[in-house]
Amino acid sequence: MLNLIYNEWLKIFSRAGTWVMIGILGLTMVGFAFLANHFSAGESNSHWKQELQAQNAELKKEIKEDPSLKDGYKETITLNDYRIEHNIPSDTGYTVWSYVTDSANFTILTGLFTIIIAAGIVANEFNWGTIKLLMIRPLSRFQILMSKYITVLLFGLLLLLILFIGSTLLGLIFFGTGGETAANIHLIYKDGHVIEQNMMGHLATTYLSESVSALMVATMAFMLSAVFRNSSLAVGFSIFLLVAGTTATAFIAAKFDWAKYILFANVDLTQYVDGTPLIKGMTMTFSLVMLAIYFIIFLLLAFGIFMKRDIAN
C-alpha cells in the first residue's frame, strides 16, 4: 500500500499543473501580505476601553428601548466587559495573527486544488488507458483505489500546511507579533461565559474547521471521478457546490428546518465555537454524525462501483 501511495504521489508531482497550483497559492499569500502591509493600520488603539464602554452603553440603551434585542447583544456586551476587566485590548494593531486569520479565507484555494486532483486521479487513468496496467498488478482494486484516496488527502493536507506555515512566516516578517500579550489571546463566548484561547491553537483549529468543506467536496469529487470516469464533470460539479453550496443552504435554512440534513449546513464547525448554529437545535455532535454519514455514502459509492466495474470496457 505504501508503494502505491508513493507512486501516486510521484504521479501528482510529475505534472506541471501541480507546481502551478502550489505557485499560485504561494503568490497569493505573498501578494496579500504586501496589500495588508500597505493598507492595514499598524498602531494599536490607546482609547479602546472608552470605545468599548461607549459601545456597551449604546447597546444597553437600545435593549431598554427594545428588550427583544437582549439576546442578540448579550455576547458583545459580555466580551466587552471581559476585555475591560482583564485589560485585553480589542485592537492591538495588525499583527501576524491578524494576517494568519485573514489568510484562512484562502482555504477555498486549497480546497479547489484538492478537488482538481481528486477529480482526475481516477478518471484520468481511464482517459489515458493506464487503468488496465494498474489492474494487472497483484493488488486488489480496493488497495488501488484506497491508495489514490489517501494520496488526495495527503495532498490536501500538504496545501493546508503550506498555507498555515507560510502565512505564519509571512505574518512574522511583515507584521510581527504586536508586542502585546493580548495579541496572542482569542476570546470565545460560550454558554454565557468568556473563555480565553491561545491564538495559535485557535487558528490551527480554525484552519482545520475551514477545511472540512473542502474535504467533503473533494471526497465527493473523488466519488464522481470513480463512478463516472469523467474528470470534467467531477471538477465542474464539485467546484460549483464548493462555491455555492453554503450560500444556497443558508437560504433554504431560513425557511425550512430540514435544511439541517443538507451537507453544507454541517461543514462549518466553527459555528459551534465562535458563532450561532445555522439552525436552532443543531449541535456539534449532530453535524459530525451527518458529515460521517455523507462521508461513508461517498466512499461506498466510489469503492462499490469501482470494484464491480468491467475495466476492459
From Swiss-Prot:
Matches recorded under InterPro entries: ABC2_NosY/YtrC-like
Highest taxon above the source species: Bacteria
Keywords for the protein's UniProt record, in alphabetical order: Cell membrane, Membrane, Transmembrane, Transmembrane helix
One Gene Ontology term of the molecular function aspect: ABC-type transporter activity
Membrane-spanning segments: 16-36, 106-126, 155-175, 208-228, 233-253, 286-306
GO annotation, cellular component aspect: plasma membrane
UniProt membrane topology term: Multi-pass membrane protein
Protein location: Cell membrane
Protein name as annotated: Uncharacterized protein YhcI
Gene: yhcI
